C-alpha cells in the first residue's frame, strides 16, 4: 500500500444508515483497522415514534456484524444539548431560523466525536457525508470539496470544519454517487441496504415541527398583515415561522383586494391575481407582526446583498475578495456573487441576480468551483421597501 492507503486505525461514525455502513466497508476493504462508533445525541423522548436511536443502533450493530468490526455506543447527548440545542432555541426565540446540523457537525461529529476517536488511538475518523477532502500540493492546506454526486453534496453542512478537523477526516462515499453506494450495500448483503435516507433534524424526526418547538417556546399570537398593512389574520408566534414560508400561515382563502392588486401592478409585479399564494416576508419582533406578501416574485422576497456574521474559513483565513459563488440554503444552485468584504467576524456578499427569501439564521456558504471556502450565519439582507425601513427580521 502507498502512504495514503497504509493500514491505519480509523474510527467510523456508524449512524445505522447505508452511507456510513458503506463507508466502514470500503475502509475495511482497504485493509484499515476499522472501529465503529454509534453516537447518541438526543435523549428527550428518544423512545417515541418520531426519533428512536435504539432502532438506529440495532441497525448499526447489524452492519458492524456483517462487516466484521467492533462497535461502541457513545452518549454525546449532554454535549449536544449544551453546544447545539441551546443555541438552536436562542436563535428561534430571536426570530431567526438556525441550521442545527451545521453546528452539530462542527461541535459534535467533528469535535466531541473526533476527540473520543483520538483517545481510542485513531489516526483518522470517517463519516458517511457526501463531500471530499483534498490536500493542496502547492499550499499544503486541506480543501473541502463538494461530493461527486451533486444531488447529495453535503459540503454546505460541513463548511465550518477547520484544517485540524479536515486533516483527520475521510469521506469515502463522497467519491461515489448514491446509486453506487446502494449497489455496494446490496452486493455485500448489508441489512440496511434499502433503508430510507434520514431527513430533517435528528432530534425532531418526522413529527410536526411546530408541535416540537412549542414544547420549548411559548406561543405569542399577533397580527398577520399584508404589504398594504391590511390585517389578514392572527399568527401563533413569530418563532414558528420562517421567511419564504407558504404553508401553515392560517390565511388560506384570503384574497387580494383591488387596492392590493393595484399596488402590485404599480411596483411592476406581473401576473399577481387574487388567488396567488401568500409568503412570509418579514417578522417584526418589536410589534409582534408577521408580514406576508402575495406572489413568489414580490420585491420583499428579493435580495441582492447580504451580510453574514460569525464567519468560518476552511483555510484558516478569509479568501481573497472578488468573484465566486454562494448558497444561502441547502440544495440551492450556486449563485454568482462577489465577496465584497471578509473577516473572521463577518462578510458581505453582492449577488449578480436577486436571491429569494434570504433568511437570517441560515448560512451563506461560499465556493470557488468545487471547493468550499467557508461561510457565515446570515444576519441581514438588502430587501427593499420593508415597512419602517427595518430588516426582514428585527
Curated annotation (Swiss-Prot):
Q: Where is this region: Interaction with target base in tRNA?
A: 99-101
Q: What keywords does the record list, in alphabetical order?
A: ATP-binding, Cytoplasm, Disulfide bond, Nucleotide-binding, RNA-binding, Transferase, tRNA processing, tRNA-binding
Active site per UniProt? 104, 202
UniProt-annotated location(s): Cytoplasm
Q: Does the keyword Cell division apply?
A: no
The terms describing its cellular component in GO are: cytoplasm
Tell me the disulfide pairings in this chain: 104-202
Q: Which residues bind ATP?
A: 13-20, 39, 128
HAMAP family cross-referenced by the UniProt entry: tRNA_thiouridyl_MnmA
Q: What is this protein called?
A: tRNA-specific 2-thiouridylase MnmA
**Origin organism of this chain?**
Polaromonas naphthalenivorans (strain CJ2)
Q: What is the lineage of its organism?
A: Bacteria, Pseudomonadati, Pseudomonadota, Betaproteobacteria, Burkholderiales
Q: Which gene encodes it?
A: mnmA
Amino acid at each position: 500500500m502507498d502512504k495514503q492507503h497504509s493500514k491505519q486505525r480509523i474510527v467510523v461514525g456508524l449512524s445505522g444508515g447505508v452511507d456510513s455502513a458503506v463507508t466502514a466497508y470500503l475502509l475495511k476493504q482497504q485493509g484499515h483497522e476499522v472501529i465503529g462508533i454509534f453516537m447518541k445525541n438526543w435523549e428527550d423522548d428518544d423512545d417515541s415514534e418520531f426519533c428512536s436511536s435504539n432502532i438506529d443502533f440495532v441497525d448499526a450493530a447489524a452492519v458492524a456484524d456483517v462487516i466484521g468490526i467492533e462497535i461502541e455506543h457513545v452518549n454525546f447527548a449532554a454535549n449536544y444539548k449544551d453546544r447545539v440545542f441551546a443555541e438552536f432555541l436562542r436563535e428561534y426565540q430571536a426570530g431567526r431560523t438556525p441550521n442545527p446540523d451545521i453546528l452539530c457537525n462542527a461541535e459534535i461529529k467533528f469535535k466531541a466525536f473526533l476527540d473520543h476517536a483520538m483517545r481510542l488511538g485513531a489516526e483518522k475518523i470517517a463519516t458517511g457525508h457526501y463531500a471530499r477532502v483534498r490536500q493542496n500540493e502547492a499550499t499544503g492546506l486541506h480543501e473541502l470539496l463538494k461530493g461527486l454526486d451533486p444531488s447529495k453534496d453535503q459540503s454546505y453542512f460541513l463548511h465550518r470544519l477547520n484544517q485540524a478537523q479536515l486533516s483527520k477526516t475521510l469521506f469515502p462515499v463522497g467519491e461515489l454517487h448514491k446509486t453506487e453506494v446502494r449497489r455496494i450495500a446490496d452486493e455485500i448483503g448489508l441489512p440496511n441496504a434499502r433503508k430510507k435516507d434520514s431527513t430533517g433534524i435528528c432530534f425532531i424526526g418526522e413529527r410536526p415541527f411546530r408541535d416540537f418547538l412549542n414544547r420549548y417556546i411559548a406561543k405569542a399570537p399577533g397580527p398577520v398583515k399584508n404589504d398594504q398593512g391590511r390585517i389578514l389574520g392572527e399568527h401563533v408566534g413569530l418563532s414558528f415561522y420562517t421567511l419564504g414560508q407558504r404553508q401553515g400561515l392560517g390565511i388560506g382563502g384570503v384574497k387580494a383586494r383591488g387596492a392590493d392588486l393595484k399596488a402590485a401592478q404599480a411596483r411592476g409585479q406581473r401576473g399577481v391575481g387574487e388567488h396567488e399564494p401568500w409568503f412570509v416576508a418579514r417578522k417584526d419582533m418589536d410589534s409582534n407582526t408577521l408580514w406576508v406578501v402575495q406572489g413568489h416574485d414580490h420585491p420583499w422576497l428579493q435580495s441582492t446583498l447580504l451580510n453574514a456574521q460569525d464567519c468560518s474559513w476552511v483555510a484558516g483565513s478569509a479568501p481573497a475578495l472578488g468573484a465566486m459563488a454562494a448558497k444561502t440554503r441547502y440544495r440551492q444552485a450556486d449563485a454568482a456573487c462577489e465577496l465584497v468584504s471578509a473577516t473572521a467576524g463577518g462578510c458581505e456578499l453582492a449577488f449578480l441576480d436577486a436571491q429569494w427569501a434570504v433568511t437570517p439564521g441560515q448560512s451563506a456558504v461560499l465556493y470557488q468551483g468545487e471547493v468550499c471556502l467557508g461561510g457565515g450565519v446570515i444576519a441581514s439582507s438588502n430587501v427593499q421597501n420593508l415597512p419602517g425601513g427595518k430588516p426582514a427580521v428585527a
